[in-house]
Amino acid sequence: MKSIWLLGNPISHSLSPTFQNAGLQYLNIEAEYSVRQVDDGELDKVMTEMRSGDVLGANITIPYKTTIMEQMDEIDPFATSVGAVNTVLVQRKNSGTRLVGYNTDVRGIIDPIINREFTLSSSRAVLIGTGGAALSAFQALVSLGFSHVDIVARNIVAAATFANRSPSVEVQIHNLNHIEHDTFASLIARADLMVQATPVGMTSGLSPNISPVPEDVMKLGLTNSLGPILVFELVYAPRETVFLRHAREYGNDKAVYIEGLEMLLHQGAESFKIWTEQSAPCL
């Protein structure tokens, strides 16, 4: 039986094996999707095993979505433009084995937003984070037509690189460690969309019971919102994070909320098709 791996750390909380294996079984594909925790310094060894083993491919999650790119023999042009890979296809031919990297996270973010038929009023967005998920979220914002993105993050050096990714988008950077609460709240109040793209709040992470947005900031920002706002949480375990709970508590009746589980399902369906060349039965 062939294998498909989920590589990352932490990954004990992942729901991907449940729906990926359900799809494989439904279509009678002889393959099993399983988690493979990769500790610091182990990535090279794991990728060597992937090349030599009976592996169809893999999903890549925190913290390897950018560093995995160095291991690829080929990267899909779209993934290159995003700057992150979350899906690997193992191509085995007479000439040898090649690892091809793709990004399905962007589709996983765009599709749930489009499905909401949400109308943009200001074309402004707030993006929290600068990691691989944030890179995908930024590309999704570009594709959706946002003209201004406020990036709020601790890694200011990484945040500065976002401005070079799309000249058509005005990017302003704010240090999460030093931004005044009133300033942070005003960014939220003016935004059409706020995306939480850090691992903060994740069940098996280092900070499972907190939000990157202080509660008073969330309250002030959402109660003073200038129009409808869509709040997108990319963390899916727990299903309702502290960030999402506060957003629901203080958002007005026109606010829209998207849970991370929706992104997981949509990006997972795209990955499934890359590995199997068949559409996932779950969507």
Residue ranges and their predicted role:
Residues K2-F118:
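Phosphate/diphosphate ligand-binding glycine-rich loop within oxidoreductases
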Residues F146-V169:
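NAD(P)-binding Rossmann-fold cofactor-contacting core
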Residues H181-V213, T223-G227:
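Rossmann-like NAD(P)-binding element
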